[in-house]
Amino acid sequence: MVRSLKKGPFVANDLFKKIEKLNNKGKKKVLVTWSRSSTIVPVMIGHTIAVHNGREHIPVFITDKMVGHKLGEFSLTRTYRGHAKTDKKSKR
């Protein structure tokens, strides 16, 4: 289901405060976060946010086309290594 417009988008408070502080100072810095469920809002455009994928933090540069999506969509948690081969060496 879609979140109610009355409530507004979810953004973690600590992440939002850090971005507001950087915007007031006019600085650009990599922000580290574990909040994959936070929605990208227009205030975040131009910042680089390192999103945790369960093993490491993946830096994500926020552009205007990402607004409305979740941070977790841009740091994949699973690595695809390909299907098993059918040759004789892989059967051993």
Swiss-Prot record:
GO terms for cellular component: chloroplast; mitochondrial small ribosomal subunit. It comes from the Eukaryota. Gene3D superfamilies: 30s Ribosomal Protein S19, Chain A. GO terms for biological process: ribosomal small subunit assembly; translation. It is found in: Plastid, Chloroplast. One of its GO terms (molecular function) is structural constituent of ribosome. The keyword Ligase does not apply. Protein S19 forms a complex with S13 that binds strongly to the 16S ribosomal RNA. Belongs to the universal ribosomal protein uS19 family. This is Small ribosomal subunit protein uS19c. It comes from Oedogonium cardiacum.
